[in-house]
C-alpha cells in the first residue's frame, strides 16, 4: 500500500525547484501519494503563514505519513508537529539542511527559531528520523544541522560536498533522500 509523503521546501524556493520534482515523480511511480507544499512568500516568509499552510494541507497524520523537508521547511515542520495535541504517531521524517538556531546570514528568519522545540514529543511520535547535511553548506552551517540531529536523536548523514543541496549546487536529483525514505518505509 502506498504512503503519503509531504515535501516541504525552504526559503526562496518553490515546488518546481531543486530536486523536488524529481523526487515527487520517483515516489509517485512507486505508488505513493505525494504533495509538494507551496509555502507562501518564500523570499519573505512569515512563520504564522507557513504554519497555517501546513495545518491546511496535512491531512490524516498517521503511520503511513512521511515528511521530507529542506532548510527552513524543517524547523517549520517541527514547530507545527509540536503544537499538535495530541501528536499522532507518524511514519518518519527526513530533514535536509535543517536547523533550529538563528542563521547569522538570514536574521529575518529568527522568528522561526525563537521558540525551542519539544524534541522529546516528536521523538516519541516516530522512530524514523534522519538529518542530511553537507560539510560545505554555505547557507546553513554544517554544525547547526548536526546539532539538530542530536536534539532530535536522528540518524545523521554527512555529505562531503553538497552545498545547500540546491539546483545551483548540482542537485536536480537526490538519490540519498530517496534511498533513506525507502528504507524507512520498509522498516514500518
Question: Language-model segments: what does each one mean?
Answer:
Residues 170-188:
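Catalytic active-site module of serine/aspartate enzymes centered on a nucleophile-bearing elbow/loop
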Residues 10, 39-42, 93-103:
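Active-site nucleophile loop of the alpha/beta-hydrolase fold
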Residues 125, 130-133, 137:
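Short beta-strand/loop motif that positions the catalytic acidic residue
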Residues 138-144:
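Conserved alpha/beta-hydrolase "acid-adjacent" motif
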Residues 68-78:
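Gly/Ala-rich beta-loop-alpha elbow adjacent to hydrolase catalytic centers
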Residues 2-63:
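Active-site catalytic motif of lipid deacylating hydrolases and related acyltransferases
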Residues 45, 162-174:
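Catalytic histidine-centered segment of alpha/beta-hydrolase-like enzymes
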Residues 33-35, 149-166:
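Catalytic histidine neighborhood in serine/cysteine hydrolases
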Amino acid at each position: 500500500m502506498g504512503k503519503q509523503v509531504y515535501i516541504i521546501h525552504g526559503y526562496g524556493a518553490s515546488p518546481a525547484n531543486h530536486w523536488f520534482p524529481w523526487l515527487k515523480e520517483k515516489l509517485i511511480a512507486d505508488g505513493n501519494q505525494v504533495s509538494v507544499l507551496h509555502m507562501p512568500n518564500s523570499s519573505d516568509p512569515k512563520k504564522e503563514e507557513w504554519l497555517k499552510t501546513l495545518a491546511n494541507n496535512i491531512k490524516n497524520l498517521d503511520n503511513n505519513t512521511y515528511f521530507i523537508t529542506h532548510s527552513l521547511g524543517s524547523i517549520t515542520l517541527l514547530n507545527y508537529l509540536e503544537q499538535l495535541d495530541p501528536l499522532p504517531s507518524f511514519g518518519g521524517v527526513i530533514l535536509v539542511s535543517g536547523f533550529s538556531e538563528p542563521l547569522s546570514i538570514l536574521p529575518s528568519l529568527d522568528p522561526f527559531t525563537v521558540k525551542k522545540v519539544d524534541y522529546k514529543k516528536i521523538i516519541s511520535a516516530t522512530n524514523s528520523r534522519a538529518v542530511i547535511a553537507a560539510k560545505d553548506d554555505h547557507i546553513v552551517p554544517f554544525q547547526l544541522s548536526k546539532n539538530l540531529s542530536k536534539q532530535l536523536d536522528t540518524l545523521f548523514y554527512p555529505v562531503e560536498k553538497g552545498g545547500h543541496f540546491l539546483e545551483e549546487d548540482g542537485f536536480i536529483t537526490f538519490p540519498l533522500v530517496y534511498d533513506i525514505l525507502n528504507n524507512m518505509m520498509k522498516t514500518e
